[in-house]
Design a protein with these regions (language model features):
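NTP-dependent small-molecule kinase module
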Residues: 2-72, 76-90, 111, 115, ...
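Conserved phosphate-donor/acceptor-positioning beta-strand/loop module used by diverse small-molecule
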Residues: 183-205, 231
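Catalytic alpha/beta core domains of metabolic enzymes, predominantly
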Residues: 402-541
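Rossmann-fold NAD(P)-binding glycine/threonine-rich loop
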Residues: 627, 643, 777-859
Length: 888
């Protein structure tokens, strides 16, 4: 029902955060909000729970922080009074973005509403439509009490009428508003949006930075009392070096300056959508799912994975290059240190943690582990830090098993989609691995609901490295539900057991390897990987790129550099061959690890395979061969973690598995190149130029992005018709293996038969163009030198054009798009595509995450255009630096 005069929705088209609400008047006395309300952030973080005091009563106390002399065998603390585990948010639950003005809430709301097909609503705009005045003007006319009452009424109506399918922006802080938001937290995500002081200061036009800092701290403390999640909106600043050098180099190439604001918004878009994907049920954000092979395998299900451990203090001091952390790592563990002696988690410290989490998420794609070091007997402070960590929605969060059952159950009940690692590192005099102490803690972690158990023993002798297998054998032999076990010895003498640990071994960044403390990781990811080969657990393998003419391929340089960076002693070399007949010996070699397949064999190579992925089947082409050495009991090829956990070991090849990663690379390029204004909608249109194997991969990539309108141009119309018929048939039979549920909109295709033919009236102009025709002479066939009709580049919001070749980067259609870059057109070429599809191949060949930044850099470093002698990296470096978007 409509109340308080709310007649209609307050949609995103008019959303602009009003500057005329006096922020200072809304926080007349910021100091009174210093204390964080325990109802949200303390033991009663769920609004439905009663507030529990932080006392040293038996229920909360850890009488001693050292380990007990005997194993923990006491029965669990009675928990009848504890609430049930907080259920996941409904997929259609509306999301509130709350926070101080200038934090970027409106921009984030529009980004999310477009991606999730939701309404974007703004409380201030709603207030103006109801009252005819801004909040500030209304307060001056009617007084603060009446203004606050009307604000509360407006927000109540918005929440009641839009409990589903909306993004709601709120900057108000009145007590009635807080109460409404706190109640909404019971069943909905209410996200506190934070930003750095300078951005807030500029937006609110506050001259005194200290005053702005005080205002931000006070408002943050207040908003944390009525929100259940937190997101730090990292401010991007343009690098002057990139701006000037990119402009100079692009101008020399006849192009335009890269659009820095576009790049900034793209990174914010990926960061925020990634965050929402972690708090909402899977499928809530259409077509955001990763296409990369390892993304579908939980990290804890893979073998020999590494979590690179970095302290919060080193990150705050800018001692580490965040992007370099990914090389060889499967997760990043943020170790929240320096809390011994603290009496509370203050607002500034909470914001620092949120900023670091945001910065890492914005620059990397691997999951985060949030680990707080439990100080001596300061469990209340520890709980504050843990509950704050849960607000940031890390993929993993550790809990110290020295806490009592009530505390552990409370944390686990609040985890939502985060996975909890029960962690224990006892004192140096801990019992041997054969002692029941360790198994009792594993059982306790499992019984209380932890998702993993991590037990780390300070090493006392070399024998400890072998004794840890006793615990692993006991766990393996145990009955009932099992959780993954992380168990090894710490310290330099414990490195052997750490290297042999299967799941999320903590490792140290390369620059810090020489300064390890006894209680810290003493292995790097590279050292741990090398240990697996030096101990003959893994074998050096052979990889190839096959094709008719692959001597110019950049794949060997790219993959060789990646293998070396990860400590993997495999080889990767090109093999040019006129036919597939000569490849039998290579692919049947016991040391064969996989191959990239080039032209003209992407279809013919299917005859060598025993099984194809569902994507390769849909496309009808293969660009990746993977040997299978272990089959399922029924003789089929495994498609889960078993396919990856058997990598890097020599043996008879029992089957060949065919995959297509070209579509993954094209999809990644399109997602990187599409501005938020051109985000895929039901009316979006894509154009495919060509009808060969790569054109099929490009078409498939657009379908995986949710594109429902696809136009095809090919010189030979019959081939275009054949391709359209193929995908139309798959679509109508619902045989397309889409990563996301398809929208209830029929996919339409249109074939343009000649370049003189006008653009079809019932199709919008394309915002995605993929050119799949050759860019250079092939034998006696000259390069086509294809020029597109200028109308094809007429989209008022620009778009993304991808040229798949890289032998030349100066094709006519690329130059056409560069000439209109000022209208929003972004160009990409084979130097963008090759690494993107190569990341997926690297995962398939090795079972490890690809070092993406390094592989991109190596492609640019190795590239040498025909007939030109220049330092490639110097001119391509700005392009590399401007790549800010990564596929998860």
């Amino acid at each position: 029902m409509a109340t308080a005069g709310v007649k209609r929705s307050f949609v995103a088209s008019s959303m602009n955060e009003s500057d005329d609400v006096d922020q200072h008047h809304q926080l007349e006395n910021p100091t009174k909000f210093v204390r964080v309300d325990a109802r949200i952030n303390g033991y009663s973080a769920s609004p439905s729970q009663p507030q529990s005091p932080r006392t040293n009563s038996s229920r909360y106390s850890m009488a001693a922080c050292s380990r007990p002399e005997t194993p923990v065998t006491r029965p669990a603390t009675p928990i009848a009074h504890l609430p049930n585990e907080i259920p996941p948010f409904p997929a259609d639950a509306s999301i509130v973005l709350a926070g101080i003005r200038g934090a970027g809430k409106s921009t984030l709301a529009i980004i999310a509403s477009t991606a999730m097909a939701r309404r974007a609503l703004d409380c201030e705009k709603a207030f103006q439509q109801v009252t005819g005045l801004t909040s500030f003007a209304y307060k001056r006319a009617h007084g603060p009490v009446e203004c606050h009452r009307r604000q509360t009424d407006v927000l109540r109506d918005l929440l009641e009428q839009n409990s589903k399918g909306a993004l709601i922006v709120c900057s108000w802080m009145e007590r009635g508003v807080q109460t409404l938001l706190r109640d909404f937290c019971r069943t909905h995500p209410v996200v506190h949006i934070l930003r750095d002081v300078r951005a807030i200061q500029d937006h609110l036009k506050i001259e005194d930075e200290e005053k702005a800092r005080s205002l931000l701290a006070a408002s943050s403390t207040l908003f944390r009392t009525c929100t259940n999640l937190e997101f730090f909106n990292v401010t991007e600043t343009a690098d002057p070096w990139i701006e000037t050098d990119a402009a100079r180099i692009e101008t020399q190439a006849g192009g335009q300056k890269p659009p820095a604001p576009y790049l900034t918004l793209k990174r914010a878009e990926r960061h925020f959508l990634k965050f929402l994907s972690l708090i909402m049920p899977k499928g809530s954000i259409p077509f955001i799912e990763s296409a990369f092979p390892l993304a579908s395998i939980p990290t804890e299900d893979r073998r020999f994975t590494y979590a690179i451990s970095v302290s919060l203090s080193s990150l705050l001091n800018n001692e580490i290059d965040i992007e370099e952390l990914e090389t060889g790592a499967d997760a990043i563990e943020i170790v929240v240190d320096g809390i011994t002696g603290a009496t509370t988690l203050d607002s500034e410290r909470a914001a620092e943690i949120a900023r670091i989490v945001g910065s890492i998420r914005r620059s990397t794609v691997i999951p985060l582990i949030y680990h707080v070091v439990l100080p001596d007997c300061s469990e209340s402070v520890y709980m504050d830090f843990i509950m704050h960590g849960l607000r940031l929605s890390p993929e993993y969060l550790t809990v110290d098993l020295r806490l009592n059952d009530y505390q552990l159950l409370h944390i686990i009940s609040m985890k939502r989609r985060s996975k909890v690692i029960g962690h224990l590192t006892p004192a140096a005099d801990s019992p041997s691995w054969a002692d029941p102490f360790w198994m009792s803690h594993y059982h306790r972690a499992r019984r209380l609901g932890c998702d993993l158990a991590r037990l780390i023993k300070p090493v006392t002798c070399i024998k400890d490295n072998f004794d840890v297998n006793h615990l692993k054998a006991l766990v393996e032999a145990s009955t009932g539900h099992k959780i993954p076990l992380i168990a090894y010895n710490s310290g330099p003498r414990g490195r052997h057991s750490a290297a042999m640990n299967h799941v999320l071994t903590s490792v140290v960044p390369e620059p810090m390897a020489s300064n390890c403390k006894p209680d810290q990781p003493c292995l790097t990811a590279v050292q741990a990987t090398q240990a697996l080969y030096n101990s003959f657990l893994f074998d050096p393998m052979k990889m190839y790129v096959f094709g008719a003419h692959v001597s110019y391929s950049l794949s060997p340089a790219m993959h060789t550099a990646a293998l070396k960076a990860c400590g993997i002693p495999h080889s990767y070399r090109p093999v040019s061959t006129p036919s597939l007949n000569g490849l039998r010996e290579l692919i049947e070699d016991p040391y064969f690890a996989g191959a990239s397949v080039g032209l003209p064999f992407k279809v013919e190579v299917i005859t060598l395979t025993h099984s194809l992925s569902r994507h390769a089947q849909a496309i009808g082409a293969v660009n990746t061969l993977v040997p299978v050495r272990r089959l399922n009991p029924d003789g089929t090829i495994p498609e889960d973690e078993k396919l990856f956990n058997c990598r890097n070991r020599a043996g008879p090849v029992r089957a060949l598995y065919g995959e297509n990663t070209d579509w993954i690379g094209i999809r990644a390029c399109l997602r990187r190149g599409l501005s938020p204004a051109n985000a895929v909608r039901p009316t979006s249109c894509g154009l495919i130029i060509g009808a060969g194997g790569m054109a099929r991969a490009a078409t498939y990539s657009m379908l995986q992005l949710g594109v429902k309108n696809i136009v095809v141009y090919n010189r030979t119309v019959a081939n275009a018709e054949k391709m359209v018929t193929h995908f139309t048939r798959l679509s109508k039979r619902h045989d397309l293996p889409l990563l996301s549920a398809a929208l209830d909109v029929e996919t339409r295709f249109h074939i343009i038969r000649t370049l003189d033919e006008p653009w079809p009236e019932d199709f919008r102009l394309p915002t995605m163009i993929v050119s799949c025709i050759p860019t250079h002479r092939i034998g006696d066939v000259p390069a086509p030198n294809f020029f597109a009709p200028s109308s094809w580049l007429g989209s008022p919001t620009g778009g993304c054009l991808v040229e798949l070749g890289y032998k030349t980067l100066d094709t006519p259609i690329l130059n056409q798009a560069r000439q209109v870059s000022n209208r929003g057109w972004v160009t990409m070429d084979g130097l963008d595509l090759l690494p993107e599809q190569g990341f997926a191949q690297f995962e398939l060949f090795t079972g490890r995450r690809a070092p993406r930044r390094l592989m991109r850099g190596e492609v640019f470093r190795a590239y040498q255009p025909d007939g030109q002698d220049r330092a490639a990296l110097a001119q391509l470096q700005p392009r590399l630096n401007n790549i800010v978007e990564q596929e998860p």
